[in-house]
């Protein structure tokens, strides 16, 4: 026993004096292809909003999430009659009749109303968490059909930046996606190492209950979720997301009906703001003010090189 205690103490002392080993390389996940399924996309977030880019070459889908994006509404779910079965449930358990106790609990320990809707909670007052939407970027390589070389998709665990890079033809393309805690928005930084080689359009969508409009350099998606009570009219949570494109080195921006196109650029920064009326009744003003405050800063602040 004394020998074991001595060895244990010796190992502690040696461990305390071992120098820290630094590899000089950041911790990261990396892949040589875009994400084929949602689970393979890189998760990014600042605690309130989240982005998940899949790193697609021709079409890139970035899933958008916001923490308060819930359908449903207030409801009285208290069931004061449930306790009447508690004694019987306990008795059955003490007698080893677990299956009977479980069945009785399932039948009596339930809330009033429709509950979770048996997996259909989105359309009953119970509600469910909802996807805010998808930001879809369609890249135009100006007719280039050259193969892709050197594709690398990486999530840096030290700085929480997701990157994708590859070479097509004579041009190298780089993308960075991250979320800003200080400015409470998502950032997408796109570059090409040749003049006028960055061409793309972006749009937004979600499965239901949304409208998208373009306004200059901005794209706005907004809508309202079901409250689970009125099935004919949406009276639940309202939401909005606004995306603004900035071209630090020039280029052309053309708004369409529900998309925004960028042509002849070599660098673009997209700022993504999101809000619901759970916290902010003026959610349209909220998403606009987040972008306005961010634009006051040097655009270089929204790149990992700054």
Listing of model-derived features with the role each one plays in the protein:
Residues 20-304:
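Aromatic-residue-lined binding/catalytic grooves and analogous aromatic/hydrophobic interfacial grooves
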Residues 4-13:
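Sec-dependent N-terminal signal peptides
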């Amino acid at each position: 026993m004394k020998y074991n205690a001595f060895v244990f103490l010796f190992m502690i002392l040696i461990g305390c004096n071992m120098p820290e080993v630094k590899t000089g390389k950041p911790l990261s996940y990396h892949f040589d292809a875009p994400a084929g399924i949602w689970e393979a996309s890189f998760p990014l977030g600042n605690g309130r909003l989240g982005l998940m880019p899949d790193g697609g070459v021709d079409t890139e889908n970035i899933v958008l999430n916001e923490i308060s994006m819930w359908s449903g509404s207030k409801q009285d779910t208290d069931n004061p009659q449930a306790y009447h079965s508690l004694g019987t449930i306990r008795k059955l358990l003490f007698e080893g009749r677990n299956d009977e106790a479980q069945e009785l609990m399932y039948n009596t320990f339930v809330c009033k109303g429709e509950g979770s809707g048996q997996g259909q909670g989105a359309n009953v007052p119970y509600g469910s968490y909802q996807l805010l939407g998808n930001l879809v970027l369609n890249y135009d390589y100006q007719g280039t059909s050259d193969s892709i070389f050197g594709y690398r998709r990486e999530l840096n665990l030290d700085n929480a930046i997701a990157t994708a890079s590859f070479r097509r033809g004579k041009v190298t393309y780089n993308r960075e996606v991250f979320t800003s805690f200080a400015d409470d928005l998502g950032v997408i930084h796109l570059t090409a190492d040749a003049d006028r080689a960055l061409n793309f359009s972006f749009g937004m969508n979600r499965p239901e209950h949304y409208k998208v409009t373009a306004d200059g350099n901005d794209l706005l998606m907004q809508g309202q979720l079901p409250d689970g009570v009125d099935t004919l009219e949406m009276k639940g949570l309202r939401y909005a997301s606004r995306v603004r494109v900035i071209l630090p080195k020039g280029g052309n921006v053309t708004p369409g009906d529900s998309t925004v196109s960028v042509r002849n650029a070599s660098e673009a920064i997209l700022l993504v703001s999101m809000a619901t009326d759970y916290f902010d009744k003026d959610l349209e003003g909220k998403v606009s003010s987040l972008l306005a405050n961010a634009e006051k800063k040097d655009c270089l602040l929204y790149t990992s090189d700054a």
